[in-house]
């Protein structure tokens, strides 16, 4: 049996559309844990009315919004404890629409490729000729970013390794989760999937993209409900936390020149072009990382390296992407052409 976890938070219309196609999967041996994450009462009532009599669905009602991380963790913990024969757990955002072979192809790919994290082919719901993402890649300046975002879907038709997946449509092996742990609850909503993907990679687990596991994603539909300055700041804090928690010292030292150059240039650009929002956010993020979050980061780092053996620094360095080409494109798009970032929409 494959458990599929779907979280709903005041997104009834999206959730009903998601569930309609999810329940038509060709892979028959699955069960949906549909979690209402403290929505308004009308959402929960409607979900119960639609799915209480469906043997493939269990509805879990949280009295408050636990966020993405804790909302999923509570169910993952229960599955790992009570379903010892389960090999994989799938996570699916409620703002998605999957093809009927989605789950079957994820499971088949995991077994064929001996992978512990399998990323879906996530396509932009509103522009289905363009990709949302194929999983994650890591820049040598700390960021873990979506790979393939905005590119033509026909460019991504082969399996390849990545640095973990977007948790909006993914498959995790329970063997891996029992060893490396579940989502780090330092996170609330955002970047928790990047951290667990990097954690898995650093500990030698295989993460891949599966092009036949196709999902249409209403990009950022859920995040738009909570996006504000504090959310943007927390994402940047999450980037620093993840990097300094999981990277071996040798990797940190080798990447240091690129890291310092990149952020010096980012500060300079934000000053010259008077991008006050990002200037304030980055200043706050560096201050809080150095003076408020430092002890937490160092303790998380100590616990991680005391309890796990990482792959070699050389292997990690080979998995990184050099930052400059990506950031030049980002500079042209958001500064020169003045297109709004995801955080300004």
Predicted regions and their residues:
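Non-catalytic, C-terminal membrane-associated alpha-helical segments of glycosyltransferases
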Residues: 252-345
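Glycine-rich, basic loop-to-helix element that forms the pyrophosphate-binding segment
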Residues: 61-82
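Short beta-strand-to-loop acidic/aromatic patch adjacent to the donor-nucleotide binding site
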Residues: 84-97
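A recurrent flexible, glycine/aromatic-enriched loop bordering the glycosyltransferase active site
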Residues: 131, 151-172, 194, 224
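Conserved donor NDP-sugar-binding/catalytic core segment of glycosyltransferases
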Residues: 96-139
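A conserved acidic beta->alpha catalytic loop
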Residues: 12, 21, 36-46, 64, ...
